[in-house]
Swiss-Prot record:
PANTHER family: BETA-ELIMINATING LYASE-LIKE PROTEIN-RELATED, TRYPTOPHANASE. This is Tryptophanase. Homotetramer. It comes from Escherichia coli O157:H7. Its cofactor is pyridoxal 5'-phosphate.
């Protein structure tokens, strides 16, 4: 099989979920009722759901079997200790707090790190800025809710869809250090390393870049949090593209990666393959005070620290899923599936970001050049794709980025992308071919697609619940 051009899915399908086919008229009515926001569509009205890979994929048989071991004790559950042991073995982190999902971890650690910086370094809350290679939307939202400005420092190649570059998710190291000096190191409560960089197109971060970033952070005594939703995909790209690690296992690369952070926050619904779950973990005793404070907040916001909003069976499933998500054959198939979709789209003239780990990212700005950024071309494209084929995708652009919380002005976005997110072990190559064919029809009518404007705009994380209409 080593010389075959295409390999089939490395799994057998045992349980299926029927989906219904709808008419164009039905879909047009549904998208209008949703306020031109695919997030607000009913799932039963979606034929292929590419909204997210977060908790929407299949689980392995070993994960499902592990649920039967669940200890549902309110405190001291043995299922918690199984999960904590997996974290120690995989990441080398000593302290584990389970959460219901990634944003549960964010709402705990962000205020704790801000308070710690204020008490120990005299942080000025009116001047504080957190840095990242690119903040995920909820991380940005929780930072802003806590009064912290966020600044993304990414390399110039990151959003140029005409450029191929191995590690488009990398930090701009000079920009990072320059930014720290500009705002004052004591006013930087944390740095977040997002692997892979979702908003840049699921693009990986190299180990060399993470090492250099961590060195800068240590120079200024700034804590680093690894946003770890797609840690296994990032490790796979390092193995494929960073020569020094080509003979390392995914497990070895993962362990090495986490030397270059102090904490990890994870939506386990991605690479750990679970329908629900998250993690907040600290590396060693140097962050025991943060761990203690976060445990206290966990009780109030998530649940007792040995379950954190998860039932025992879910913790057992997560303890196994962390391992199953690192399977090399599985990762090779998953990355190849994304590449197949990107190649097919580009063959019909649809410009995409280079293939990343979890999704194809269509350059909506180039497909719909007549729609200005403030009329959200990628959101308009998402609505058209649903009308044409019942495919639900998600905008990653100006609509998602939102407004400056201080000025109320739209933040400038480096690219207007439509994310076609592939749930794990859910769709086959035939589905990918259908998506490509759908874009042929969309492309034929591209010049007639209209921009969008708000009828309802929430102040925080607007893309989830906003409503729009055609201009």
């Amino acid at each position: 099989m080593e010389n075959f051009k295409h390999l089939p899915e490395p799994f057998r399908i045992r349980v299926i979920e029927p989906v219904k086919r709808t008419t164009r008229a039905y879909r047009e009515e549904a998208i209008i009722k949703s306020g031109m926001n695919p997030f607000l569509l009913d799932s039963e009205d979606v034929f292929i759901d590419l909204l997210t890979d977060s908790g929407t994929g299949a689980v392995t048989q070993s994960m499902q079997a592990a649920m039967m071991r669940g200890d549902e004790a309110y405190s001291g559950s043995r299922s918690y200790y199984a999960l904590a042991e997996s974290v120690k073995n995989i990441f080398g982190y000593q302290y584990t707090i389970p959460t219901h999902q990634g944003r549960g971890a964010e709402q705990i650690y962000i205020p704790v790190l801000i308070k710690k910086r204020e008490q120990e370094k005299g942080l000025d809350r009116s001047k504080m800025v957190a840095f990242s290679n690119y903040f995920f939307d909820t991380t940005q939202g929780h930072s802003q809710i806590n009064g912290c400005t966020v600044r993304n420092v990414y390399i110039k190649e990151a959003f140029d869809t005409g450029v191929r570059y191995d590690f488009k998710g990398n930090f701009d190291l000079e920009g990072l250090e320059r930014g720290i000096e500009e705002v004052g190191p004591n006013n930087v409560p944390y740095i977040v390393a997002t692997i892979t960089s979702n908003s840049a197109g699921g693009q990986p971060v190299s180990l060399a870049n993470l090492k250099a970033m961590y060195s800068i952070a240590k120079k200024y005594d700034i804590p680093v949090v690894m946003d770890s939703a797609r840690f296994a995909e990032n490790a796979y790209f390092i193995k494929q593209r960073e020569a020094e690690y080509k003979d390392w296992t995914i497990e070895q690369i993962t362990r090495e990666t986490y030397k270059y952070a102090d904490m990890l926050a994870m939506s386990a619904k991605k690479d750990a393959m679970v329908p629900m779950g998250g993690l907040l973990c600290m590396k060693d005793d140097s962050f025991f005070d943060v761990y203690t404070e976060c445990r206290t907040l966990c009780v109030v916001q998530e649940g007792f620290p040995t379950y954190g909003g998860l039932e025992g069976g879910a913790m057992e499933r997560l303890a196994v899923g962390l391992y199953d998500g690192m399977n090399l054959d599985w990762l090779a198939y998953r990355i190849a599936q994304v590449q197949y979709l990107v190649d097919g789209l580009e063959e019909i003239g649809v410009v995409c970001q280079q293939a990343g780990g979890h999704a194809a990212f269509v350059d909506a700005g180039k497909l719909l050049p007549h729609i200005p950024a403030d009329q959200f071309p990628a959101q308009a494209l998402a609505c058209e794709l649903y009308k044409v084929a019942g495919i639900r995708a998600v905008e990653i652009g100006s609509f998602l980025l939102g407004r400056d919380p201080k000025t109320g002005k739209q933040l400038p976005c480096p690219a207007e992308l439509l994310r076609l997110t592939i749930p794990r072990a859910t769709y086959t190559q035939t589905h990918m071919d259908f998506i490509i064919e759908a874009f042929k029809h969309v492309k034929e009518n591209a010049s007639n697609i209209k921009g969008l404007t708000f009828t309802y705009e929430p102040k925080v994380l607007r893309h989830f619940t906003a409503k729009l209409k055609e201009v």
